A protein has these predicted regions:
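SAM-dependent transferase fold signal centered on methyltransferase-like domains
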Residues: 5, 9-18, 22-497
């Protein structure tokens, strides 16, 4: 006996209009089951449990676990999960923590979900990719919904949004939260994301000037194997985006994939077709995410190095050769709030001439800036973590006119402060050798400093013991090798213009 879906099903969910009838029926039945399961949500908990959560949400969860006997009316496992989740949200998702009535999943899901700054960045990225018309006609499909943090921010840029998640525990939590957040245009589907992808209609080829609604598919493949161990290779993640690449590009105009920051983005470019953008996203100088944007048509590859309000972008030809340096002129314009990351508007060329794109042959003929041995540089520049991850060291030197200390240290020198440099800047106080007399003279009166080593034979701890310095303070020591000589650079932090 064949079960078929009636016309009302297709009217209810535009994404099902080209599905086979049996597939559409199964998907909608799963959606109905999830809607029924939401009865276990916070709205159905007794008053004693809700009051316990509200009263103790800032308390130590380990201590609260012993209060079960004294609170027999409290659903203690659920209450402890909510308190722990809210405490994590206060750190990772402050906007959610400030919203009463949200429900939180188990601890592991909270730790694995995106932070608020990175979710906002992806929302702004999606909005730029699909344009303003997506709010009236666009479709977002998140095939790996999870707790729904990324989905909840991205969905606001689309007329219709579909959340797909195979974990039957997470789906009702996500649906409850979406309702609390005012997302009334979303569909929840429980099941395998790959199966849902294969049931999606093919997206027609678009011609210039076409006004058809855009479809964007988002994936955050699970980076743990069946034994719970972390994996980092794309083929080891679930789902395998390398295997699905062709299928994804047949069913979406744009595909955004989130990968581990441990992955080499050059490897991703080699294994996946039609990557048009690579985003290396850091928060507070800690690399958090690697985002890939795939498009149906082949485009020049652009790399975005993002760290809070600092963004540096450049274009590469093929898989590795640079074409141009690019810089967003104003860091402040990248934010709509103090804590939000936003996708940059690209301004191509060198800072001195932002309107001109540097031709490929000209870029490779540019001599890297060098420092004269007789000149004493006044500023040391340290690239942020996204620059380090992207490996765009030549691009930085050419774009800002600064010189590298060495090809291995990835530290730069300048005769003055460099506006908009994507990293930290330090005023050089002294440069010394490792000679005992030179060290004694250079560090006279210095008892405390932060120490970093780059291409240097000693570890930071070993050097600290040798210099007999306490950790911390306002001074910074960078130990590196210049040519064949080991050097220590004593600095203090510089407020960049």
């Amino acid at each position: 006996m064949s079960l078929r879906a009636g016309p009302s099903i297709y009217n209810r969910d535009p994404s099902l209009r080209h599905c086979a009838p049996d597939q559409a029926f199964i998907i909608v039945i799963r959606t109905y089951v999830i809607a029924r399961r939401t009865k276990h949500s916070s709205s159905m908990k007794n008053e004693a449990t809700l009051q316990f959560v509200q009263l103790h949400r800032e308390d130590d969860v380990n201590r609260l676990a012993f209060l079960g006997d004294k609170n027999p009316d409290v659903d203690m496992p659920w209450a402890l999960a909510q308190i722990s989740g809210w405490q994590t949200a206060r750190r990772k998702l402050p906007s959610w923590a400030a919203c009463d009535g949200l429900e939180y999943p188990p601890h592991l899901n909270m730790e694995q979900c995106s932070s608020e700054p990175t979710a906002i960045y992806k929302a702004s990225l999606a909005s730029r990719l699909v344009g303003a018309d997506a709010a009236e006609h666009g479709l977002l499909v998140d095939l790996t919904g999870g707790f729904g943090v990324d989905f909840s921010w991205m969905a606001r840029a689309f007329a219709h949004a579909v959340y797909v998640e195979r974990n039957e525990t997470l789906c009702p939590i996500a649906q409850h939260n979406f309702q609390q957040l005012g997302l009334d245009h979303v569909e929840i589907h429980v099941g395998d994301g790959v199966a849902y992808l294969q049931a999606m209609p093919l997206v027609p080829e678009r011609k210039t000037g076409d006004a058809h609604p855009l479809t964007l598919i988002y994936l955050d493949p699970a980076r743990r194997d069946t034994y719970g161990r972390k994996v980092f290779g794309m083929e080891d993640c679930t789902p395998d985006v390398v295997e699905l690449c062709d299928t994804l590009l047949l069913r979406a105009d744009i595909v955004v994939i989130k990968l581990s920051p441990m992955l080499d983005w050059h490897e991703a470019v080699r294994k996946l077709k039609n990557i048009s953008e690579v985003h290396v996203v850091s928060v507070s100088n800690e690399c958090k995410e690697l985002l890939l944007v795939l498009t149906r048509e082949k485009r020049p590859l652009r790399v975005f190095c993002v760290n809070d309000g600092q963004t540096f972008t450049y274009c590469v030809s093929g898989a590795s050769r640079p074409l141009e340096g690019a810089l967003r002129a104003s860091d402040d314009a990248l934010r709509s709030s103090d804590d939000a990351l936003h996708a940059p508007e690209i301004v191509s060329g060198r800072p001195a001439d932002a309107s001109r794109v540097m031709p490929e042959e000209e870029f490779h003929n540019v001599s890297l800036p060098t420092h004269s041995p007789d000149a004493t540089p006044s500023v040391l520049l340290v690239p942020n973590s996204s620059i380090m991850k992207a490996g765009c060291f030549r691009e930085i030197a050419v774009a800002f006119g600064v010189s590298q200390i060495s090809s291995d240290a990835h530290l730069y020198l300048s005769n003055g402060a460099v506006p908009h440099f994507p990293g930290r800047q330090f005023r050089i106080l002294r440069i010394t050798s490792m000679n005992k007399r030179d060290l004694r003279q250079a560090f006279q009166g210095v008892s405390q400093a932060n120490i970093a080593v780059r291409h240097f034979p000693l570890t930071a701890d070993a050097l600290r013991r040798r210099l007999k310095l306490k950790d911390g303070g306002s001074l910074y020591v960078f130990a590196t090798t210049i040519g064949k000589d080991h050097r220590l650079i004593l600095t203090e932090k510089l407020v960049a213009p």
